[in-house]
Amino acid sequence: MREVAIVSFAQAKAKRRELDANEVEILMPVVQEAVARSGIPKREIGFTVSGSCDYVAGQPFAFVSALDAVGAWPPISESHVEMDGAFALYEAWVKLQTGEVDSALVYSFGKTSMGDPAAVLNLQLDPYTVAPLGIDAVSLAAPSLIGQQSCLRSGDA
């Protein structure tokens, strides 16, 4: 196995609601900072992979516009996982292990304030039996929480 190291990290300031900037405007300075800190010239990054959840953004193919923050010109080797940054990191690690590339840029993002999370997250449910009920996240969690409380009270936990 090849040794792999994370040589740089950058993160946008976490905000409860961001109304003044879109995902590209949030990502661009973060990606630029991470690349600059790495000391690896951008043209030498062999692979770029992102992780995000289009459901959370409330729009299909949200990751495509995020490529503007990376700067996909000249053409780059790029991939996207519809999951969090840990899965994107894993994909980059696999690519590095194959020896196909020597460096990778991994980033993940999510901006729930683009849509109403209560309405958007419902779209991830089974489209035939559960989603039509219009169950919000709190109501969906209630049976599980009631079961957990019951287990704790019984002393079986």
Where do the language-model regions lie?
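Flexible, low-hydrophobicity surface segments
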Residues: 101-104
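Conserved "HGTGT" condensation-loop signature of ketosynthase/thiolase-family condensing enzymes
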Residues: 1-77, 93, 97-98, 108-157
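A short, glycine-/small-residue-rich helix N-cap motif at loop->alpha-helix starts
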Residues: 84-85
